[in-house]
């Protein structure tokens, strides 16, 4: 049966030549209750409603169309429901299975509690595993490099590199003891200028009380053994004249352990360890450790200069604040 279609209605022309942003909706035709529902022209299909009847057409083909169409719509809904049925029961199953979440570029110091606090808002966290890469982090690698490649320990505690001559000026007692472990001299030098008490004083006194070992004769047996703590024959030594600008050494009390010195070169000692020249420290070391108790009238300022009562500067210059035995 031919269906009457209304003429197509076009939207009104745009005003001022400006096209409208949105096209107006197509007008709906007036409903016709004569048994046929008109269809807009843009739809290319005919809709059938279950209440629609065609009594004027006795044909069996046309009479079965509404029934078939009515049955097709529920079948489509059932098919959609059937297709979606496996999806709904599968959601709880998928939620029950734990998901593995990989997170990269987390801070180096993050641990399990930190990650649980960060990602716990998205669901229950069963386990947290932190995997470090093979290189390790930059901070950890640098720390390991510092710890493994240790430099040799500096022999001086405060990092100073002391010249033996300078060190002898500041701490001559330590340089006079040959059995003293010289690489650790800086430890004793660090104590200079301080009043030693307790542990430091005990260490200092231990080094100070150790006598030097016997010297080794080198140039001449009688000449180099003059400072050994045992009687040495002095008959073979001749007096040595001094230059006019050099003052003679003060007279010391005579004793078998410390015979009178007639030549300045007789005070040289060669030590066994060879850490420094004996010509520099020999006389002073022997004076410090071989001086008897009877020589209390003369005192030293720990710089190698000996002041006696007959010194013209004795009344003006007193003993300086030193680090020798007398001031301990």
UniProtKB/Swiss-Prot annotation:
Gene Ontology biological-process annotations: mRNA processing; nervous system development; regulation of alternative mRNA splicing, via spliceosome; RNA splicing
Biased composition annotated in UniProt, kind: Polar residues: 49-87
A GO term for molecular function: mRNA binding
Modified residues (Omega-N-methylarginine): 192
One protein family per Pfam: RRM_1
Residues the UniProt record annotates as site (Interaction with RNA): 100, 108-109, 133, 138, 145
GO cellular component terms attached to this protein's record: cytoplasm; nucleus
InterPro entries, sorted: Fox-1_C_dom (IPR025670), Nucleotide-bd_a/b_plait_sf (IPR012677), RBD_domain_sf (IPR035979), RBFOX1-3 (IPR017325), RBFOX1-like (IPR047131), RRM_dom (IPR000504)
Cell compartment(s), UniProt: Nucleus; Cytoplasm
Protein's job: Pre-mRNA alternative splicing regulator. Regulates alternative splicing of RBFOX2 to enhance the production of mRNA species that are targeted for nonsense-mediated decay (NMD).
PANTHER family given in the database record: ATAXIN 2-BINDING PROTEIN 1-RELATED, RNA BINDING PROTEIN FOX-1 HOMOLOG 3
The name this protein goes by in its record: RNA binding protein fox-1 homolog 3
